[in-house]
Amino acid sequence: MEYKANKKLKIIMIGDYNSGKTAIFNEFAGRKFGIYTCPSTFDLFYKEIMIDDELVGYHFWDTAGQERFTSLNRHFYRNANCCVLCFDIHNEESFKNLDKWITELHSKCLENGLESEKLSPPFVLIGTKSDIPRTDKSISNERIEQWCKNIEDQRIIDKVHYFETSAKNSKNIKEPFNIISKFALNYFNSMQKLNESKLNPTLEISNNNNIKSSSC
């Protein structure tokens, strides 16, 4: 494959095993729903996207089931520019474990040499399997909104952008990844400026992603 983009960014998919993130990953990669077999290690694909008249290359990484065994190794998180944090809107455990995944993201980034967890890459929250009708056991919109508010109140991220998707019906796949791609580029450019300006104490970097989208 011929790479035309000068900037190569990394986007990672995180969330519980069987949360639906691999189905979303495969749908965005153009693979047919339900027939793809995961490899034994991390799965990835490359895509070049035009962002504001700039061609940017993106390496998308999925865990491919590795999260079943233990926490992911720090290599998976190294040089990530944005995270896609997924949960199954019908699965209580996958929703409760969202905090665990954010904690792991921050800890692995610190292990990889990031100076502060406040400099961790931004994330977009995706609720999967929206094609399945909600029941009393499903995660309510009110609980999701409260989780987003708690994250914002803790200043983990300025604003949580949330989307509900269905890989089976190809519903709401492109829009979140358009936002994710822009967040990744913003983060990459900010970190590049920070690295070039270590001696400038007035430089501030944050996860303030003021891009219009569905949000909590």
From Swiss-Prot:
What GO biological process, any one, is recorded here?
phagosome-lysosome fusion
- TM regions (residue ranges): none
Provide the binding site for GTP.
15-22, 62-66, 128-131
Which SUPFAM superfamilies does this one have?
Answer: P-loop containing nucleoside triphosphate hydrolases
Show the GO MF annotations: GTP binding; GTPase activity
Q: Which GO terms describe its cellular component?
A: late endosome; lysosome; phagocytic vesicle; plasma membrane
- Signal peptide (UniProt feature, chain positions): none
Main localization, broad class: membrane
Which residues bear S-geranylgeranyl cysteine-type lipidation?
216
Which InterPro entries does the UniProt record give?
P-loop_NTPase (IPR027417), Small_GTP-bd (IPR005225), Small_GTPase (IPR001806)
Keywords noted in UniProt: Cell membrane, GTP-binding, Lipoprotein, Membrane, Nucleotide-binding, Prenylation
Subcellular location field: Cell membrane
Q: Where is this motif: Effector region?
A: 37-44
Pfam families, alphabetized: Ras
* Bilayer disposition of the protein: Lipid-anchor
Family label: Belongs to the small GTPase superfamily. Rab family.
NCBIfam families associated with the record: small_GTP
Q: What is this protein called?
A: Ras-related protein RabN1
Q: Can you name the source organism?
A: Dictyostelium discoideum
Q: What's the encoding gene here?
A: rabN1
